[in-house]
């Protein structure tokens, strides 16, 4: 390129740059929020005490967004302040909801804010004709690896005996999953006997590693049932079997004190956070790398708006994302977010190929993997 042509093209850059905001703004219709509806759908996970309330946010432009989470009273309280707002000013709405009312928002309000925030991002995606991962930074992976909450149960034996760990592992691998999950903190039928439970945990973990060989991974959930000394004893017993992660090894009320202590005394990767809200619940644990995986999920943290900030915090400190299972709307949103996350991702998923009657084709699941879609 000749010098004169180069200078001429360079001079045109500011004018082109000034035009970009107008072009971007033109892609979004001028509209306001007109109505928020709240629904109680069929209970998809009756064994779990988890809200699956649905919300729809309607606009003058005829675009309706769908969200999930919260309870009726809190949703109604939060929804009223949305009426008349520009649905595309998502951060401004989030900040106003966070600061509103007399008291700091608790986890119930965070969940309700998360439901409404999901609906606002849905509106934006529909207005632009783009999936959320394209509105963000674009996908860095084609799918998210999953594990099944209760694994895949093998066919019943002729004797009626319960399946062995080896049989459960094989059924899980055959279904396409690469990670087999176990629980260490199930209450059982008698008094809580920590010593015998930890010895059984060690036997099960050894059996899982032997069954998996080098073809897969295993993890175990301590379910916050162990004090620090017992958690340490359990972690030491299973270190040699190379777990993918140990989840919630200590009691929740002691997390901020005991997880850093445990971190210094064991080599197992630690995961925590399925009950956390936004970043201030755990930022120190992430910043000090006291955990390897963050289990926080949608809509609990306050929606996609907050989840993106959590992802940035975790990426900065090399912490992977392993969100707790959630409802179908939030699951679809999580997949859209996490295909943009460049570090380790593992997805807890327990719907399998089961159809959701009120939300067909909400995501694509196949052979242990969740794929984002353009719907």
Predicted stretch roles:
Residues 1-2:
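N-terminal secretory signal peptides
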Residues 77-78, 85, 89-92, 236, ...:
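Shared catalytic-loop signature of beta/alpha-barrel
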């Amino acid at each position: 390129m000749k010098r004169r042509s180069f200078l001429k093209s360079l001079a045109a850059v500011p004018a082109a740059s000034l035009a970009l905001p107008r072009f971007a703004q033109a892609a979004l219709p001028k509209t306001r929020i007109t109505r928020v509806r709240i629904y109680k759908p069929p209970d998809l996970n009756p064994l779990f005490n988890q809200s699956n309330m649905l919300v729809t946010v309607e606009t003058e432009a005829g675009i309706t967004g769908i969200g999930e989470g919260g309870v009726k009273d809190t949703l109604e309280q939060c929804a009223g302040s949305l009426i008349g707002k520009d649905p595309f000013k998502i951060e401004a709405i989030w900040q106003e909801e966070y600061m509103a009312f007399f008291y700091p928002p608790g986890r119930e309000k965070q969940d309700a804010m998360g439901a409404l925030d999901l609906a606002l991002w849905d509106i934006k995606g529909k207005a632009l004709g783009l999936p959320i991962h394209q509105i963000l930074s674009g996908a860095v992976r084609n799918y998210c690896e999953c594990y099944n909450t209760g694994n895949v149960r093998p066919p019943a034996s002729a004797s009626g005996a319960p399946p062995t760990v080896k049989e459960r592992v094989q059924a899980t691998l055959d279904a396409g999953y690469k990670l087999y999950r176990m629980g260490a903190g199930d209450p059982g039928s008698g008094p809580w006997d920590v010593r015998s439970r930890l010895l059984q945990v060690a036997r099960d973990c050894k059996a899982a590693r032997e069954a998996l060989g080098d073809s897969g991974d295993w993890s175990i959930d301590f379910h916050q049932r162990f004090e620090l000394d017992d958690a340490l004893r359990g972690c030491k017993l299973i270190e040699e079997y190379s777990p993918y992660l140990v989840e919630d090894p200590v009691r929740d009320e002691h997390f901020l004190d005991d997880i850093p202590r445990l971190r210094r005394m064991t080599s197992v990767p630690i995961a925590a956070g399925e009950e956390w809200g936004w970043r201030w619940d755990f930022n120190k644990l992430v910043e000090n790398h006291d955990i390897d995986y963050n289990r926080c999920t949608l809509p609990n943290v306050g929606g996609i708006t907050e989840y993106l900030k959590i992802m940035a915090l975790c990426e900065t400190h090399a912490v992977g994302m392993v969100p707790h299972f959630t409802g179908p709307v939030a699951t679809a949103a999580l997949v859209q977010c996490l295909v943009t996350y460049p570090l380790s991702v593992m997805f807890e998923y327990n719907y399998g190929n089961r159809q959701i009657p009120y939300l067909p084709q909400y995501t694509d699941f196949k052979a242990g993997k969740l794929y984002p879609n353009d719907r």
